[in-house]
């Protein structure tokens, strides 16, 4: 789904991407992403982000679908995950991904992140990488939002807000 949207999209083998909202042919683009090109001041003024600089519940896909306290993680939480875990490329139930295992005070925690990418990121090989939205817009680019990138590298990055990335809810 595009960043700041809550209705989502699903794959359709015959016609590409189909919007769940209206079930018509759909393509991720700048024109159909309401947050694209808006700086943080505009996002805050229009009610997309709060005083902390993260998506409000009404525009948080995890909260919209699962209810509170579920939400999208922030880029700071993605950075903490990277800094406090070891990561191992593995497979669970036939799905490739990264197993994040906590270190130190977090040693009893782990999370599996499937290697999945969204709609407009066809340059990344399926089943070999993952791109997950954060709730944080990129502060230096009014067209981007923060992501957790799982590819040859494992890092916090950014992606065009209209890209169809996936959401990994947290609480």
Where is each model-derived feature located?
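Conserved positions within compact, well-structured domain cores
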Residues: 1-171
